Amino acid sequence: DRAPYEVLSTKWLTYAEVIRLKQIEEMVEVYYNSGQFCCTMAALEQEFASPFCMYECLAAYYDEKNAFAVSHSRIGRYEILYDFIVKTCKERSEQYMEMLTLDMYLRDNVKKRPEFLRESGVSSDEAAAFYKKEEKERTYLKAYEGYDRRQMRKMTHLERIDGKTVLFDYKNRDP
């Protein structure tokens, strides 16, 4: 019967420290617990003394950019994370761009790419040839029996990552 409350400070933690911990918690929720950034975050953790240190720095970056005050789209979260990566690991930002691309397409067949991503690297002609061949041979998309090449193209995605062409299949996946 007691009203819900939130601790704002204790005799051990100041208000500012509690807020800082809440910000770090939000970064862990968004970038780790969501499961949307698995590849990127696993690699990015190696750039810091500890995972906590990384999330603390990311929270400080959000605070510096006043990003906690705004609700962000999923694509917006990718853009903020990429900006953070450029600031902290500029010399490896290309590698992280590919990891972010992989994370993004593992989750969803994104139609609008974040601004920092270049084109997929797979030309229209290459994609058309792949789906035309796949329509006849069903080498990679056996579960798409009964679908024509246009339907398969809408239900999958081709992306060039690290010099290799990767096929993302969205028919059978975890949500």
Listing of model-derived features with the role each one plays in the protein:
Residues 17, 25-26:
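A cross-taxonomic marker for long C-terminal extensions/tails that follow the last structured domain
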Residues 26-175:
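Radical SAM enzyme core and accessory elements
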Residues 7, 15-18:
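Polar, glycine-rich mid-to-C-terminal structural blocks
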Residues 1-2:
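Flexible glycine/proline-rich, aromatic-decorated loop/lid segments
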